């Protein structure tokens, strides 16, 4: 039972860590674009969306190798825990 709780806890932690970086990037880009729009009095609605989309895609592309390593390591841990119990 403790192993199941450990695996669930680790999964929630990984979701928090892995989703944190794109969220931080989108927030920073949104603030910068909003500041730019305020200073220039630009009223374009789709500008922040497009720039945030590009920023998050770039972030996911750059971190994809690390994401793969982390998820593969977690999958191995869960499989080893399951095999040790069974």
From Swiss-Prot:
It is a multi-pass membrane protein. GO terms for biological process: protein secretion. Keywords: Cell membrane, Membrane, Transmembrane, Transmembrane helix, Virulence. The chain crosses the membrane at residues 16-36, 53-73. One of its GO terms (cellular component) is plasma membrane. It comes from the Bacteria. Its main location: membrane. It is found in: Cell membrane. Belongs to the FliQ/MopD/SpaQ family. Involved in a secretory pathway responsible for the surface presentation of determinants needed for the entry of Salmonella species into mammalian cells. PANTHER family: FLAGELLAR BIOSYNTHETIC PROTEIN FLIQ, SURFACE PRESENTATION OF ANTIGENS PROTEIN SPAQ. This is Surface presentation of antigens protein SpaQ. It comes from Salmonella enteritidis.
């Amino acid at each position: 039972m403790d192993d199941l709780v450990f695996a669930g806890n680790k999964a929630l932690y990984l979701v928090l860590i892995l989703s944190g970086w794109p969220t931080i990037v989108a927030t920073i880009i949104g603030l910068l674009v909003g500041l730019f729009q305020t200073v220039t009095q630009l009223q374009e609605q789709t500008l922040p969306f497009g720039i945030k989309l590009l920023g998050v895609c770039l972030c996911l592309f750059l971190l994809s190798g690390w994401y793969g390593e982390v998820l593969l390591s977690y999958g191995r841990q869960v499989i080893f825990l399951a095999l040790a119990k069974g």
